[in-house]
């Protein structure tokens, strides 16, 4: 090669323009489902994705949401491809307003109507945080990312803030979405 140039790429940077990020501080995991129910009662959301850290947690939360009357479906790595594709197509078409997922959908899905992403479980990796929250606010629209944070999760939240040079404020009680 003649006259090669060297291109330096910075570490992954937070490129979440238009996405408001918040956390909700909770005492422990047992508070999460009740908090999620309260959130759905008080905040208007067109479509939302809720992320959990395990297949069992996704399945259990989906069952609980459906029992509470929420039009919800799930996608996780324990499902075969046809079942995942069916859930994705139905969610994208608007048959379901809530998609509950493991990190299998944190990259690569692009649904314009998703306005809110909820980290029911804070991701284990700072890199995954960006990909999860980035599912909202697509196509130039505004989006919201809300993370449930227990006392045990506070260090991970601080690690995310440091890594992305950002502050993730507590969700204000006056918050309205959509």
Q: For the regions a protein language model found, what residue spans apply to each?
A:
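Conserved helicase RecA-like core
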Residues: 1-178
